[in-house]
Amino acid sequence: MFTEEMVHTALQTWCDNVVKVGKVHAEGGDAKAFSLQVLSESYDYDNGHVLFKPTLTFGQQTFRPTKEGALSYFVGGNSDYPDDNGFKLKPWVKVWYSKEDFILHGDLAIVQCNVHFIGEDDSHIFVNKSFVFKLCDDGKVKIILHQSSLPYQP
């Protein structure tokens, strides 16, 4: 059964991993390998189906139903996804969530929130997120839906 504490842990882990990927990259580490590890630990690509709509995608590559597509969005460098620049490589030095709301439904948590990103250059953006987290049979929490968009600007 999913709990409120598990929602906050899952969201904080997601935010922390964004910072960690950028740090690995900035320190000359293998950001691609680290991102693959994060994808395996945090998303259900290896065992199931994931619905992922990154913030800055469009056209034929708007949705990323494969681990390869998600990895490309996070770290770039894949010629099959020429518009991906590696969103997580900026690096982001601080990432946090706010204004979360959620529905707990058995082994699922359906979550909406804002996520704020502070760049090394002190830039600040925030995006609207929707996640569905699943409590898997092995006790691990995995993302099965991740939707991200920029706030509407009239």
Annotate each language-model stretch with its function.
Residues L104-Q112, H116, E120-P154:
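Short beta-strand edge/turn micro-motifs at domain boundaries
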Residues A10, D16-L36, Q147:
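N-terminal membrane-sensor/transducer module of prokaryotic signaling receptors
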Residues M1-D16, P151-P154:
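Basic/polar N-terminal segments that are highly enriched at the extreme N-terminus
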Residues E4, H8, V21-H25, H49, ...:
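Mature soluble binding/inhibitory domains
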Residues H25-K99:
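A solvent-exposed, acidic/Ser-Thr-rich amphipathic alpha-helical stretch
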Residues F2-M6, I103, D121:
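Conserved aromatic-histidine-acidic binding/catalytic patches
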Residues V18, G22, Q37-Y43, V111-V115, ...:
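N-terminal, helix-rich and Lys/Arg-enriched segments in bacterial and organellar proteins
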